[in-house]
Every structure is written in structure tokens, then in C-alpha cells.
């Protein structure tokens, strides 16, 4: 059974962290970066979330250009998984595909549409940053 930590980013820069397992975690499996998920999966009824990235149990980031959920070694000029320090620098990095699988441990998401209640009201006035 899969379990994830879902980090939901708000427009104002606030991040909320949720532990998701069981049936709610199954809503994320098979989804790819850029797809939307119902906010009920993390306890935000009426909200819609877009998957923006994530990482696996080894800390490898999800890369939107890699299909599937497998790992791949790519020659990167910058972006996800590598920040060059010199102009023209390239490096081979191992990244995870864009699809959420049971190997995924953290999922990053952003809010696409809001529900009736604010997040603070749904969480009881606390933010889990």
C-alpha cells in the first residue's frame, strides 16, 4: 500500500503538508505531472489540486519530460535535479519519470480551484508548514 506526503502550495507562498495513505493515496497513483486531483484526497473538500512534481524514496526528483514512473539517467543542462554553476555545464543525473507510482514518497501540488471554505478553516486555524 502506498503512502505519500503531499505538499500543497498556495498562491501566497504558504505550503501545507499532508500525510496520505490507503484509499486516498490510490487517487494519486497513475497520475502524471500536470494532471489534477480532487482535494478530498488530502482533506480539502471542494478544492482541485494540480500535481507539479515530487520525489521518490531516494530523493530523485520527478521530471516532466520522462514518460512513465521509472528512473532514467539524463544529460542535463539545468532544471529539475541539477543547477549548473558555469555557463555550458552539463551533468548526468538520475531522475524519476513524471508518473506517480508506489515508489513516490513526496508529491508537490498547487491549488487550481478553491472550495467554499478557506484552508485555515478546514485545518482548524493551523497551517502545517
Swiss-Prot record:
Name the keywords, alphabetized.
Ribonucleoprotein, Ribosomal protein
Q: Which GO terms describe its biological process?
A: translation
Q: What GO terms are given for molecular function?
A: structural constituent of ribosome
Domain of life assignment? Archaea
Xref: SMART domains:
Ribosomal_S6e (SM01405)
Q: Which InterPro entries match?
A: Ribosomal_eS6, Ribosomal_eS6_arc, Ribosomal_eS6_CS
Q: What Pfam families is this protein classified in?
A: Ribosomal_S6e
Cellular component GO terms, alphabetically? ribonucleoprotein complex; ribosome
Where, if anywhere, are coiled coils annotated? Answer: none
PROSITE patterns in the cross-refs: RIBOSOMAL_S6E
Chain segments carrying region Disordered: 106-129
Q: Which family does it belong to?
A: Belongs to the eukaryotic ribosomal protein eS6 family.
Fetch the HAMAP family from UniProt: Ribosomal_eS6
Q: What is this protein called?
A: Small ribosomal subunit protein eS6
